[in-house]
Curated annotation (Swiss-Prot):
Keyword Metal-binding listed: yes
Site (Important for catalytic activity): H27, H262
Names of the cofactor(s): Mg(2+); Ca(2+); Mn(2+); Co(2+)
Entry's Gene Ontology molecular function annotations: metal ion binding; transketolase activity
Presence of keyword Signal: no
Active site, UniProt feature: E411
InterPro entries named among the record's database cross-references: THDP-binding, Transketo_C/PFOR_II, Transketolase-like_C_2, Transketolase-like_Pyr-bd, Transketolase_bac-like, Transketolase_BS, Transketolase_CS, Transketolase_fam
NCBIfam families according to UniProt: tktlase_bact
Source organism per UniProt: Bacillus subtilis (strain 168)
Chain's gene name: tkt
Assembly, per entry: Homodimer.
Disulfide bond positions: none
Protein name: Transketolase
Function: Catalyzes the transfer of a two-carbon ketol group from a ketose donor to an aldose acceptor, via a covalent intermediate with the cofactor thiamine pyrophosphate.
Length: 667
């Protein structure tokens, strides 16, 4: 290690120490141990443009070990991103650009929100998938307009999480050679020595999953690190894991190599002793020697800007030779849709009857005909979820151009990979599974919502109507649970036209994910136009079948498959001179964003007798039914029997709805 390298690594370490000390909060051990690998990667290999952090063909970097955020912030500052010393001093403070864990969209240069361990690796896999698909789709002859690498730094905790195995298995199967993961192997976890809980042979595990595994014995050896990354970059047929042996809290005389340095500041005295161990002679905290700034300016900033300029020149020529492809790619990068994107979306007529999963399959195929960068897949349930794009090919290790992704029985990895694909940009992505298994990918949905990613989830088999498979496969609490998640839009459509509307809203999203909750059983098409359905779904709730009188005797509020039931019950109640209005409420979150005036139009304040009908938990419906209303829901688990039998046994029948309304009115 030469003098400038040594000084640069020491600067990264001391900046991280100082930020954590000032905040009196954070994780110094990982940045202190992993600083040399981050330095080597960023100054010798990473192509990034600090002045334009969103440059499309930049290398992607995911700090899967997100608790080491001080390391990333130090790298971003030194590299010339919009992150000042004052920002580093604001580490973990209210309103700062340097939150405790990296947040996408909050800090320039952060490519993914990380912190929940394991998900960063899986998002990096998604980014590598996106790079390969876009490269295969748009690269032509000598024009490699998409050809970057995806890098990640992870720790022991990441590799203990199950999602890392799911994602690594998928990456190896797909031969994602441009994915390189540096493993900060320091033999320490938060609770103590790693051998208390983790003793497997990581090398053999990853080799069994078709990864190349390299080993760096000394994590402080820049030459050794450089050679390993160079070798990894040469392997186009396998992703690479580079195990780098490090010492957590390197340089700390009393805490290096212990769990005590993982998640607590060093303290004033230990910080002083540690800096002395680095031969750091500067008294001032947050000090950066001018020669270190100059070194990073050349190695990262100027190098990256040159690469971006070369890419811009190449893309300008590409536009001349392949104008249509270039226009398409530019549209995809901007996240915009083609002008006629919804022209092939089907319209459903009264009299037809189709499961919403089936109409969803038709709609997504209509969208795929007009949106060339619309891609997705399923966690081994494509036939049931109806997520296959016809005549679009499969994304495989031998053909990355296919638009159908086979995630296998890896729901969590699918969710996180979709996040990575969305973060990468250039694609509109969706993924499907049974609604009950949304719990398997919930942490990835949460990160999608937190990052504001327009991912679409196709959740089918949405209720006890699943039938014979029984309570393990019948969702009950999932609707209420996902509705509680901020910035996730959940839509449960009542028929084909509402399903088409839901998809239209989902693909137009730019700042939130959407969960489509769809039936296995057929649903009758409601007597309204597709335009009326779109207008209603867009507002989250609307009167789908009016009462005869201006003020009804009662309101029936339902979602999904229960809207048809409510309309049937309305007709029966009319025979007994009970006049009710039926409200379809496919999306509570959308309805909550409407004006008070509109809400009162749909749910008149003077109509107190209200019955909500939904084959799921009653939790949350009280807000709309009020103290004088009632909920026909399910607050126990399902059962194994034919679907119609269970539906009737649980009270979702016209006679029971009629009786419940009568009971309300007679209260």
């Amino acid at each position: 290690m030469d003098t400038i390298e040594k000084k640069s690594v020491a600067t990264i370490r001391t900046l991280s120490i100082d930020a954590i000390e000032k905040a009196n909060s954070g994780h110094p051990g990982m940045p202190m141990g992993a600083a040399p690998m981050a330095y080597t990667l960023w100054t010798k290999f990473m192509n990034v443009s600090p002045a334009n952090p969103g440059w499309f063909n930049r290398d992607r970097f995911v700090l899967s070990a997100g608790h080491g955020s001080a390391l990333l912030y130090s790298m971003l500052h030194l590299s010339g991103f919009d992150l000042s010393i004052e920002d580093l001093k604001g580490f973990r403070q209210w309103g700062s650009k340097t939150p405790g864990h990296p947040e996408f969209g909050h800090t320039a240069g952060v490519d993914a929100t990380t912190g929940p361990l394991g998900q960063g690796i899986a998002m990096a896999v998604g980014m590598a998938i996106a790079e390969r698909h876009l490269a295969e789709t748009y690269n032509r002859d000598s024009f490699n307009v998409v050809d970057h690498y995806t890098y990640s730094i992870c720790g022991d905790g990441d590799l203990m999480e199950g999602i890392s195995s799911e994602a690594a298995s998928l990456a190896g199967h797909l031969q994602l050679g441009r994915l390189i993961v540096l493993y900060d192997s320091n033999d320490i976890s938060l609770d103590g020595d790693l051998d208390r809980s983790f003793s497997e042979n990581v090398k053999q595990r990853f080799e069994a999953m078709n990864w190349e595994v390299l080993y760096v014995e000394d994590g402080n050896n820049i030459e050794e690190l450089t050679a390993a990354i160079e070798k990894a970059r040469q392997n186009e047929k396998k992703p690479t894991l580079i195990e780098v042996k490090t010492t957590i809290g390197f340089g700390s005389p009393n805490r290096a190599g212990t769990s005590g340095v993982h998640g607590a500041p060093l303290g004033k005295e230990e910080s002083k002793l540690t800096k002395e161990a680095y031969a750091w002679t500067y008294e001032e905290d947050f000090y950066v020697p001018s020669e270190v700034y100059e070194h990073f300016a050349v190695a990262v900033k100027e190098s990256g800007e040159k690469k971006e300029q070369e890419w811009n020149a190449q893309f300008a020529k590409y536009k001349e030779v392949y104008p249509e492809l270039a226009e398409q790619l530019e549209l995809a990068i901007k996240g915009e849709l083609p002008k006629d994107w919804d022209q092939e979306v089907p319209v459903y007529e009264k009299g037809s009857s189709l499961a919403s999963r089936a109409s969803s399959g038709e709609v997504l195929n209509g969208l795929a005909k007009k949106i060339p960068f619309f891609v997705g897949g399923s966690a081994d349930l494509a036939g049931s979820n109806k997520t296959t794009i016809k005549n679009a090919g499969d994304f495989t290790a031998v053909d990355y151009s296919g638009k159908n992704f086979w995630f296998g029985v890896r729901e969590f990895a699918m969710g996180a990979a979709l996040n990575g694909m969305a973060l990468h940009g250039g694609l509109r992505v969706f993924g499907g599974t049974f609604f009950v298994f949304s719990d398997y990918l919930r942490p990835a949905i949460r990160l999608a919502a937190l990052m504001g990613l327009p991912v679409t989830y196709v959740f089918t088999h949405d209720s006890i109507a699943v039938g014979e498979d029984g309570p393990t496969h019948e969702p009950v609490e999932q609707l209420a649970s996902l509705r509680a998640m901020p910035n996730l839009s959940l839509i449960r459509p009542a028929d084909g036209n509402e399903t088409a509307a839901a998809w239209k809203l989902a693909v137009q999203s730019t700042d939130h994910p959407t969960a489509l909750v769809l039936t296995r059983q057929n649903l009758p098409t409601i007597d309204q136009t597709s335009e009326e359905a779109l207008a209603g779904v867009e507002k989250g709730a609307y009167v789908v079948s009016k009462s005869k009188n201006e003020t009804p005797d009662a309101l029936l509020i339902a979602s999904g498959s229960e809207v048809g039931l409510a309309i049937e019950a309305q007709a029966e109640l009319a025979k007994e001179n009970i006049d009710v209005s039926v409200v379809s409420m496919p999306s509570m979150d959308r309805f909550e964003k409407q004006s008070d005036e509109y809400k009162n139009e749909v749910l008149p304040a003077d109509v107190k007798k209200r019955l909500a009908i939904e084959m799921g938990s009653s939790f949350g419906w009280g807000k709309y039914t009020g103290l004088e209303g009632d909920v026909l829901g399910i607050d126990r688990f399902g059962a194994s029997a034919p679907g119609e039998t269970i539906i009737n046994e649980y009270g979702f029948s016209v006679p029971n709805v009629v009786n419940r309304v009568k009971a309300l009115i007679n209260k």
